[in-house]
Amino acid sequence: MSTINASSGIIEFTRIFLAVFYTCVAAFYTVKIIVAQIKQPVDLVLPGERFCSTWWNHMTFRFFRLSIWMVCLFRVFFEEIDNYLIMFTSLQTLPIIFTGISLMIFGFMMTIIVHLSMGDKWRSGIDSEGPKQLITNGFFKYSRNPIFLCVAISQIGFFLALPSVFTLVCLTIGLLMLYRQILSEEKHLTKLFVNEYKIYTASVRRWL
């Protein structure tokens, strides 16, 4: 496989792509939350009580999401930032980077689709007063956590698109926070729905 050094064009493309991609991600969630709260004035982002486990999950995820966005934006204007990311040059090949970009696009597009399919039932975090009913149809017939699955796919893609110590740390922490959040949500749903959730978990996998 030819290395990226043989084609500086893909480096510049990836640099711009990542900045645009994470700007779109930030814009999507910002617009979605604003529009949703206009339609129904309720809290949609529920990190939990301050310093509890789910609160730490949310804060850690927000920190890394903001860090990723800022790094990708600044890389467009300051190429020397790459020197501090500790790049894995052996992974900087066209097939790997294009695979990463493809996974990022696929993961994000599927995240949007799942979000839209949930309508006003979507929440970020655990609603102490809900949900009123267990969602088992649509994408939830195939995965108990379709949005988290799509986010994980996109995170893996980010590492492949920009293979470095920085993206590896982001991937590792990101997957850990997703897993911790899943465990907390499963515990909450088990208390709410008991037998119904037990039957659901027996027939549908946590991931896929």
Q: Model segments located where?
A:
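Active-site-proximal inter-transmembrane loops
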Residues: 125-148
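Cytosolic histidine kinase catalytic core of two-component systems
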Residues: 147, 195-196
